[in-house]
A protein has these predicted regions:
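Residue-level detection of beta-strand scaffold positions
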Residues: 17-20, 43-46, 74-75, 80
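Local sequence-structure signature of Cys/Sec-based thiol-disulfide redox active-site neighborhoods
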Residues: 2-40
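Short Fe-S-cluster ligation motifs
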Residues: 53-69
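Eukaryotic short linear interaction motifs
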Residues: 26-27, 53, 92
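Non-catalytic, surface beta->alpha helical segment in thiol-disulfide oxidoreductase systems
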Residues: 68-98
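Short, glycine/charged-enriched secondary-structure capping and boundary segments
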Residues: 32-35, 60-61, 87-89
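Thiol-based oxidoreductase modules, predominantly thioredoxin-like and allied folds used
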Residues: 3, 20-21, 40-57
């Protein structure tokens, strides 16, 4: 994945993943460590839930779905295709292959 891709580029790509995180989320830290060792097959961007206002305003259904962190949204060509609650590498991979 190219470094520094903005969330807009991820969402507009053929297949991209946005992961919502929080500073106090231990599962988010664990997932980030796992994904740094074993990257996913699609471009990905991490967004702190406090900084997701623009994303949420463009994708209100995604915003309304966010509950258990880390929370992943799988996008394709500007459309939300799938969400993954309490995301793990395995759950995200399953959603990508669905």
């Amino acid at each position: 994945m190219p470094l520094g891709m903005a969330w807009e580029e991820i969402v507009d790509s053929e297949l991209g993943i946005i992961i919502i995180r929080a500073e106090d989320c231990l599962h988010c830290v664990e997932l980030r460590a796992i994904l740094s060792e074993q990257p996913l097959s699609a471009p990905m961007e991490w967004i702190d839930k406090q900084n997701a206002t623009d994303l949420y305003s463009q994708y209100p259904l995604f915003a309304a779905s966010v509950d258990i962190l880390p929370f992943a949204g799988i996008f394709s060509d500007g459309e939300l295709k799938q969400v993954v609650r309490a995301a793990t590498r395995e759950r995200i991979e399953d959603a990508l292959s669905a």
